[in-house]
């Protein structure tokens, strides 16, 4: 069986790009719908860049700059989706 290899890709960030944990707007690009950090094969980052992104996201979550947990990213249970009128019999 032939081993599958990852195709070459164009890097969007230079090798020495700094992913700042104090800028949550730029880090939300690397967070999926469920609140998980996207893998490098989807975000097209190198191994070193993926490690730096993961560390920045974790640090930002610890400082409460980014929400942690899947409940924060869930669109079904948002307050505006729930009716404010109580159920009547």
Curated annotation (Swiss-Prot):
MF terms (GO), sorted A to Z: small ribosomal subunit rRNA binding; structural constituent of ribosome
Record's keyword annotation contains RNA-binding: yes
Role of this protein: Binds as a heterodimer with protein bS6 to the central domain of the 16S rRNA, where it helps stabilize the platform of the 30S subunit.
One GO cellular component term: ribonucleoprotein complex
Key words of the record: Ribonucleoprotein, Ribosomal protein, RNA-binding, rRNA-binding
Source organism per UniProt: Bdellovibrio bacteriovorus (strain ATCC 15356 / DSM 50701 / NCIMB 9529 / HD100)
Pfam families for this protein: Ribosomal_S18
Subunit description: Part of the 30S ribosomal subunit. Forms a tight heterodimer with protein bS6.
GO biological process: translation
Residue pairs linked by disulfide bridges in the UniProt entry: none
InterPro entries in alphabetical order: Ribosomal_bS18, Ribosomal_bS18_sf
Similarity remark: Belongs to the bacterial ribosomal protein bS18 family.
Name the record gives this protein: Small ribosomal subunit protein bS18
């Amino acid at each position: 069986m032939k081993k599958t290899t990852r195709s070459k890709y164009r890097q969007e960030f230079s090798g020495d790009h700094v992913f700042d944990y104090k800028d949550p707007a730029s880090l939300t690009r690397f967070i999926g719908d469920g609140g998980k950090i996207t893998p490098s094969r989807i975000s097209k980052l190198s191994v070193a860049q993926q490690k730096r992104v993961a560390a920045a996201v974790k640090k930002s979550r610890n400082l409460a700059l980014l929400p942690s947990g899947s409940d924060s990213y869930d669109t079904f249970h948002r307050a505006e989706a729930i009716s404010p009128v109580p159920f009547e019999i």
